[in-house]
């Protein structure tokens, strides 16, 4: 049974300061109330889906903050939990993200590669920048997008200020991340590094089918795909 948080007394947990949810997020996250022999239990929808090994990566509801350290910590914790729970069963990472911090995104990426289960990635809406990189980093053969999803790759964004030596240090760090991301994208897509470097010089948008041809994903998911044996 699915209810609004205003329809059930247990939904007051979403208003708890301990959850640290933005006000807009707490107002629209649905509650799932389950009946069992031991009574009622209420879950926010994301916790309930986590029981089915589904993780969502996106900006907070009502904002487009994207991937930051707090988001990365949450995703990493969920991946580690599911790895400990069942190391053989696939994990599904749904991505609708404008991107964000490179270092935070790499924390998620390294964890995806570290854990034992296959990580199936699926883009719905938008996977841009680091979101597209994580989409491509799913288990080969299990990287997907919905038909109207958009995928965008580009080089890391950054800026520096201060003394000349500080600017030089930051510039070297940006170039390191650019080179590393391009190498990994080349590895995941099968594209030559020269093409990756050229395509990521500016925002490079693709449809789901174009992303499949490029090698960022393996299949475009349709209703027929889901119904096929």
Swiss-Prot record:
Protein function: Cleaves peptides in various proteins in a process that requires ATP hydrolysis. Has a chymotrypsin-like activity. Plays a major role in the degradation of misfolded proteins.
GO terms for biological process, alphabetical: protein quality control for misfolded or incompletely synthesized proteins
Pfam families given in the database record: CLP_protease (PF00574)
Coiled coil location: none
Transmembrane segment boundaries: none
Gene3D superfamilies named among the record's database cross-references: 2-enoyl-CoA Hydratase, Chain A, domain 1 (3.90.226.10)
Entry's family note: Belongs to the peptidase S14 family.
This protein's GO CC annotations: cytoplasm; endopeptidase Clp complex
The keyword Hydrolase belongs to this UniProt entry's keyword annotation: yes
Primary location group: cytoplasm
Active-site annotation: 129 (nucleophile), 154
UniProt keyword terms in alphabetical order: Cytoplasm, Hydrolase, Protease, Serine protease
Catalytic activity: Hydrolysis of proteins to small peptides in the presence of ATP and magnesium. alpha-casein is the usual test substrate. In the absence of ATP, only oligopeptides shorter than five residues are hydrolyzed (such as succinyl-Leu-Tyr-|-NHMec, and Leu-Tyr-Leu-|-Tyr-Trp, in which cleavage of the -Tyr-|-Leu- and -Tyr-|-Trp bonds also occurs)
Protease recorded as keyword: yes
Enzyme class: hydrolase
PROSITE patterns xrefs: CLP_PROTEASE_HIS (PS00382), CLP_PROTEASE_SER (PS00381)
A molecular function GO annotation: ATPase binding
EC assignment: 3.4.21.92
Protein name in the entry: ATP-dependent Clp protease proteolytic subunit 1
Localization (cell): Cytoplasm
Species in which this protein is naturally found: Thermosynechococcus vestitus (strain NIES-2133 / IAM M-273 / BP-1)
Subunit text: Fourteen ClpP subunits assemble into 2 heptameric rings which stack back to back to give a disk-like structure with a central cavity, resembling the structure of eukaryotic proteasomes.
């Amino acid at each position: 049974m699915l209810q609004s948080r205003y329809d059930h007394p247990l939904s007051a947990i979403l208003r708890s300061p301990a959850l640290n949810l933005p006000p807009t997020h707490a107002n629209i996250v649905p509650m799932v109330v389950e009946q069992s022999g031991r009574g009622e239990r209420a879950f926010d929808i994301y916790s309930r889906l986590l029981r089915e090994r589904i993780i969502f990566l996106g900006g907070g509801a009502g904002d487009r903050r994207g991937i930051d350290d707090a988001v990365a910590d949450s995703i990493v914790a969920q991946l580690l939990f599911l790895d400990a729970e069942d190391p053989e069963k696939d994990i599904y990472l749904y991505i609708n993200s404008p991107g964000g911090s490179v270092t935070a995104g790499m924390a998620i990426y390294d964890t995806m590669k570290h854990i034992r289960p296959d990580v199936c990635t699926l883009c719905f809406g938008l996977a841009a920048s680091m979101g597209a990189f994580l989409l491509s980093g799913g288990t080969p053969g299990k990287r997907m997008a919905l038909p109207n999803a958009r995928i965008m790759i580009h080089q890391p964004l950054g800026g520096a200020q201060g003394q000349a030596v500080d600017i030089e240090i930051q510039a070297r760090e940006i170039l390191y991340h650019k080179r590393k991301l391009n190498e990994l994208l080349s590895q995941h897509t099968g594209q030559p590094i020269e093409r990756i470097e050229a395509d990521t010089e500016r925002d490079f948008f693709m449809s789901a089918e174009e992303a499949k041809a490029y090698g960022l994903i393996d299949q475009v998911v349709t209703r027929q795909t889901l119904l096929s044996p």
